[in-house]
Amino acid sequence: WASWCLPCIAEAPHLENLKRQGADIVGVAIRDRPEDVARFLAQHGNPYSRIGRDDLSEVQLAIGSSGVPETFVIDGQGVIRYQHIGDVRASDVPVLLAELEKAR
């Protein structure tokens, strides 16, 4: 995700919903400044248990991400089990929860 990403704003309440339902969401801020990340989180909420920085898009490229926002379900071994391209919408929440359950 990124503070400059408009679809990231749209998905923010749905990520909060996932968090409320028990999802552990780890964010990776793509090409972003810490002060902009802090402002975004203050305005739109913070569903993340942790946030990493990817100033050069190295993580993004390594996992095969095509852009922001993008959501991955990663199992306990670090294997990507599901990839959702684009912003998370209300209709995607049950799908993501099911994929999280399968990845356990």
Q: Could you tell me what each predicted segment is?
A:
Residues L15-E16, A38-L41, L97:
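Short amphipathic alpha-helical segments and helix-helix/interface helices
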Residues W1-N17:
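Conserved redox-active cysteine motifs that mediate thiol-disulfide chemistry
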Residues A10, Q21-L56, V68:
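Conserved segment of the thioredoxin-like fold in thiol-based oxidoreductases
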